[in-house]
Amino acid sequence: MATVDRWLLPDGIEEVLPPEAARIEIARRQVLDLFQSWGYELVVTPHIEYLESLLTGAGQDLDQRTFKVVDPQSGRLMGFRADFTPQVARIDAHTLRREGPSRLCYAGSVLHAQPRALSTSRSPIQLGAELYGDASPTSDVEVISLMLATLQLTDVADVHMDLGHVGIYRGLARAAGLSGAVEQQLFDALQRKSVDEVQALTADLPKDLGNMLRALVELCGGREVLAEARVRLGRAPASVLAALDDLLAIADRLASRYPELPLYFDLGELRGYNYHTGVVFAVFVPGEGQSIAQGGRYDDIGADFGRARPATGFSTDLKTLVTLGRAEVVLPAGGIWMPDSGDAALWQQVCQLRNEGQRVVQALPGQPLSAALEADCDRQLIQQDGRWQVLPLTH
């Protein structure tokens, strides 16, 4: 590599400089404090671990986004975490092994081999919260509410939410006896809203099931979609009707708590279909092609760790929230310039100032007073009348 190229970073990998790094860190602390106030406990997971553990229950999408390396000590394949959820699920199922509900949260960098979308970061700072041990819509509403509180804390404006339920499609596909290949083809067609493909793939099914699967393309819009779904899917299996009931219960609670929040329903939206088992949700803002926060229910993710506990949660990228948020993050302003001196009294004074939360920068040998300005100092320590005093910086 030529010297001129050594400063280049890989596509989608970025460094964060001051003061943006300080804004992100302050926001991280604020969000974790918010999570704690809701009863969520922080966990810290490994950056890298054996691949079979990292991808357990996570589906093919996560496999494709995971950087893989060979462990030089064991010779086993390892992966850098691309998502916290499988790791947190292992902690709940195998390590904590609590009988009752467990609320866990996290914040840290993840690494993606492939970007989520064009021009998106491959090294986001993922933060999120997960609730294990309760299968009711109440838990889904809780994590959605915490997600909205996170967006409110960072002052992300003009949000709207998409809601769906993968159990609706899964129940219809199971009733139709679709093979794995056809189920995947139909899934792909539904995501693209391809009416002709959906029609062709369901043409040979029993009339009622074919009509209900085709209806999923059109069952998208406002609150009225849920009432329409009750009619058009009225002959669906009990599991599908139960999924509709759950979605309605969640929508009712959200509408009560957030009457100004636009809710959009799409019963053909199957985000995370490979591992989600129930409600799925995502938040969008104008001007962003991808969701800025997302989540759902994934009751089976802990099965490979010995406990298939009910689970629901959400995640978001902290760097995106700080970029989009309008909240003013107040950074510590100014500082105190400390002269280069071996005076013990000066050192005691500096220690006291720092303990009080003051920012004190020491001059290095040969540095002129003008260097204090580059260090963002507006005051200085000067010895007067036999003691060190903090005075305005003189130019």
From Swiss-Prot:
InterPro entries: aa-tRNA-synth_II/BPL/LPL (IPR045864), HisRS-like_core (IPR041715), HisRS/HisZ (IPR004516), HisZ (IPR004517)
Keyword Hydrolase: no
Locations listed in the record: Cytoplasm
Keywords, ordered alphabetically: Amino-acid biosynthesis, Cytoplasm, Histidine biosynthesis
CDD domains in the cross-refs: HisRS-like_core
Keyword Amino-acid biosynthesis: yes
Any one GO biological process: L-histidine biosynthetic process
One CC-aspect GO term: cytoplasm
Pathway annotation: Amino-acid biosynthesis; L-histidine biosynthesis; L-histidine from 5-phospho-alpha-D-ribose 1-diphosphate: step 1/9
Pfam families: tRNA-synt_His
Domain of life: Bacteria
Homology family: Belongs to the class-II aminoacyl-tRNA synthetase family. HisZ subfamily.
Subunit structure: Heteromultimer composed of HisG and HisZ subunits.
Miscellaneous note of the record: This function is generally fulfilled by the C-terminal part of HisG, which is missing in some bacteria such as this one.
Main function: Required for the first step of histidine biosynthesis. May allow the feedback regulation of ATP phosphoribosyltransferase activity by histidine.
Descriptive protein name: ATP phosphoribosyltransferase regulatory subunit
Originating species: Pseudomonas putida (strain W619)
